[in-house]
Design a protein with these regions (language model features):
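Positively charged, low-complexity nucleic-acid-binding target-recognition regions
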Residues: 243-248
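Core catalytic lobe of class I
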Residues: 1-236, 242
Length: 248
């Protein structure tokens, strides 16, 4: 199910104790469209708030989300650093999630093995102030109330490979096709959904975008709730999910 709405408001309307897993990647607040590494921007969202306001918005959303989660539910947040690592947004998120009462499960490093054209070196060949591009992102995993989950449908091989907190796979390569500037690849929600949920579980993505989490949910036999601000993204996400076949 795709809901076209402002997630900061709509999460308050979700049923209490109804969500088993959250898999999401909120806007990174890196000024997409004016960012020299990404000239594409969101259709309906200005990705350039003052950092304090941005963090307060996210904190408010996850505070409102807490009563909507079942006990033991996991919350997985994919986020990148800003300014070549000088602004550690992931650290701020960990801090406010702990303040809200979420339990830390793990922090996974997603090695994308991708760096933009390195034409800006800072102080080239000098220790003064070199630039440190970050070809990786974080996947922060939290839990509500307790750390135990018993029902899963992942294989032994998947568990062995994915329980190492360093994941290496390529970023999404079809963003131009879909017209969205910041999609994650199906591999990211696939691993999180299989690690932290089971068939029939209800998965929420409050920043649904092109519905990639929903596509994987349908393939894997999970229920899906996606919230997205932009109407065109909602329509394309709906079409993607409808066209997706269930994996037996």
């Amino acid at each position: 199910m795709i809901i076209c709405a402002n997630s900061y408001e709509y999460v308050k309307k979700l049923e209490d104790d109804s969500i088993d897993l959250v898999v999401t990647s909120p806007p990174y607040n890196v000024d997409l469209g004016n960012n020299k590494y990404n000239k594409s921007k969101y259709n309906s969202y200005e990705d350039n708030l003052p950092q304090k306001e941005y963090l307060n918005q996210l904190k408010g959303l996850f505070a409102d989300l807490m009563p909507k989660l079942k006990s033991g539910a996991r919350v997985c947040i994919n986020i990148g650093a800003k300014a070549n690592g000088r602004i550690a947004t992931h650290s701020d998120i960990i801090q406010f999630m702990n303040e809200l009462g979420y339990l830390n499960v793990t922090q996974i490093i997603w090695d994308k093995s991708q760096v933009g054209n390195r034409t800006s070196w800072g102080s080239f060949c000098s220790p003064s102030c070199p630039s440190f591009p970050t070809p990786f992102e974080y996947i922060l995993v939290f839990a509500k109330d307790n750390l135990k989950l018993q029902e899963k449908d992942l294989t032994k091989e998947e568990f062995i490979d994915w329980s190492l907190a360093l994941w290496k796979f390529a970023p999404e390569s079809q963003m131009k096709k879909y017209g969205h500037p910041a999609m994650f690849p199906k591999e990211l929600p696939k691993r999180l959904i299989k690690l932290f949920s089971w068939k029939g579980a209800t998965v929420l993505d409050p920043f649904s975008g092109m519905g990639t989490t929903g596509v994987v949910c349908k393939e894997l036999g999970r229920k899906y709730i996606g919230i997205e601000l932009d109407e065109s993204y909602c329509q394309l996400a709906h079409e993607r999910i409808i066209a997706t076949e269930v994996i037996e």
